[in-house]
Amino acid sequence: MKERIYPLLFSKNSENFSFNGCNFVVQKAREATARVVMWREFNLINSFTLETTFCGPTDGRYQDCHFTINILKECGRLFCKTLLDYASNEPKVREAIRELETMFPPQKAEEGLSQHFLPNNDDSRK
C-alpha cells in the first residue's frame, strides 16, 4: 500500500489529479515498462506513469476545458510540492496513511501501513 501514499497526497494538492483514476494493478501489457521493471528488479515502489488527456478533466474548475500549457505547468509545480510534502511533511503523510488504512483496511492490526512506513512512536522528530 506504500505506493498509494504519494498519489493520494498529489490528489489532495492538485484538483486535476484523480486518486480514484489511479490503477495500481500491473497489467500483462505493462510488464516491460520501466516502472514495472524498476519495481520488480529493485523494489522501487514510487515509480509512476503520469498521463493526461488533451480534453481535460471531467470535474473541478477546469471541467470540460482543454488543458493549456499553464495548467500543465501548474500540475508540474504541484507535483514538485507533493514531493516535498512526501519527503518532509510527516503530519500530511500520517494523515494520508490513516485515510488509506480506512479505504483499504489491513488484514491484521500489525500489518497497518503506519507500522512499516513511519518512524517509531518514540521518534524524536514528533
What residue spans do the PLM features occupy?
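Structured catalytic-domain cores with a bias toward divalent-metal coordination
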Residues: 1-126
